[in-house]
Design a protein with these regions (language model features):
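Charged helix-capping and loop-helix junction motifs
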Residues: 66, 138-142
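A residue-level signal for conserved active-site and pocket-lining positions in enzyme catalytic cores
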Residues: 14, 51, 75, 123, ...
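N-terminal active-site beta-alpha-beta segment that forms phosphate/nucleotide-binding
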Residues: 2-118
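Glycine-rich, N-terminal phosphate-binding loop of Rossmann-like dinucleotide-binding domains
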Residues: 53, 126, 184
Length: 195
């Protein structure tokens, strides 16, 4: 099986696993993973955070977004553009639309744009992940192109335990993350003393 075929299989299995969670499991899991993220020093210290609006059964960070906003943190959301580009947009109160792939997305003309090097923390969704912080995304490479430019940010994947695989199918274009947060634990591929 090729890497592309392995990624497709892991993507399909990971999406099915997260969709299979009951409403009760999903509610408890979302609360637990948001609490884990908010307990990390990298969250506490972050001023500018890129997160995402949950789609297709992804881990929901709404509770984290509410608390982060209450703390005065700046919250940006990804906008997918031409050429598989990604922009971190801070939407105004009336600055939302349903964008590419049916995802709730900021309207760029009604948003402040943050450069990648302004971000302190990037929370990345995935379809599958492994314990050494590799991820399988949706297959377009938006985050893989964007993350190398986030030079000062801690980059954390967010997923449910059910999405973990023994070894994520990755190639030279896939960006390894600094860590992963799930409802059940934390996975880090480096020294965690700074987190």
């Amino acid at each position: 099986m090729t890497i592309t075929e392995q990624k497709a299989a892991q993507r399909k299995a990971g999406i099915a696993a997260r969709r299979a969670l009951s409403d009760t499991e999903r509610t408890h899991s979302n609360a637990a993973l948001c609490a884990r993220i908010m307990a990390l020093d990298c969250f506490k210290k972050a001023e500018n955070i890129l997160l995402y609006a949950a789609f297709c059964g992804e881990a929901d960070l709404s509770a984290l977004a509410v608390e982060a906003a209450r703390q005065g943190k700046t919250l940006a959301y990804p906008v997918c553009g031409e050429g598989f580009s990604l922009t971190a947009a801070v939407p105004g109160p009336d600055g939302w639309e349903v964008g590419a792939y049916g995802i709730r997305t900021p309207i760029l003309s009604r948003s402040e744009i943050l450069r990648p090097d302004q971000l302190d923390l990037v929370l990345v969704p995935c379809t599958a992940f492994d314990a050494v912080c590799h991820r399988v995304g949706m297959g377009k490479g938006y985050y893989d192109r964007y993350l190398p430019r986030c030079t000062r940010a801690v980059k954390l994947g967010v997923a449910f335990e059910a999405q973990q695989v023994d070894a994520a199918a990755v190639d030279a274009y896939d960006e390894k993350l600094d860590g992963f947060v799930t409802e059940g634990g934390l996975y880090f591929g480096f020294d965690t003393t700074e987190l």
